[in-house]
From Swiss-Prot:
Allows the formation of correctly charged Asn-tRNA(Asn) or Gln-tRNA(Gln) through the transamidation of misacylated Asp-tRNA(Asn) or Glu-tRNA(Gln) in organisms which lack either or both of asparaginyl-tRNA or glutaminyl-tRNA synthetases. The reaction takes place in the presence of glutamine and ATP through an activated phospho-Asp-tRNA(Asn) or phospho-Glu-tRNA(Gln). This is Aspartyl/glutamyl-tRNA(Asn/Gln) amidotransferase subunit C. It comes from Rhodococcus erythropolis (strain PR4 / NBRC 100887). The gene is gatC. One of its GO terms (biological process) is glutaminyl-tRNAGln biosynthesis via transamidation. Heterotrimer of A, B and C subunits.
């Protein structure tokens, strides 16, 4: 006996707002039954003695060492700015007063 019936597929199709023909209902019932059987096999294979893992690859974070490098001086950083006020980038106001 299939795990999922044609009526259940029709119900799922209605919930999904899919218009399926009778042939499609029969086809999808068979496909979903096959999928559920494969899932059942996988759940039977999964053993309690196998620890769960988030990633099958044994990859660790590869980071570079922190090295202090000189940054830009304020003058260098502001040299390309179209407008500067009090050693800061000047930008147009986008919010009104009190917002």
């Amino acid at each position: 006996m299939p795990a999922i019936s044609r009526d259940e597929v029709a119900h799922l199709a209605r919930l999904s707002r899919l218009a399926l023909s009778d042939a499609e209902l029969d086809e999808f019932a068979g496909q979903l039954d096959s999928i559920l059987n494969h899932v059942k096999v996988v759940t039977e294979v999964a053993a309690d003695d196998v620890p769960p893992m988030a990633n099958p690859n044994a990859v660790t974070n590869v980071t570079r060492p922190d090295v202090i490098v000189p940054g830009l001086t304020p003058e260098q950083a502001l040299s390309g700015a179209p407008a500067v006020e009090q050693d800061r980038f000047a930008v147009p106001q986008i919010l009104g007063e009190g917002e």
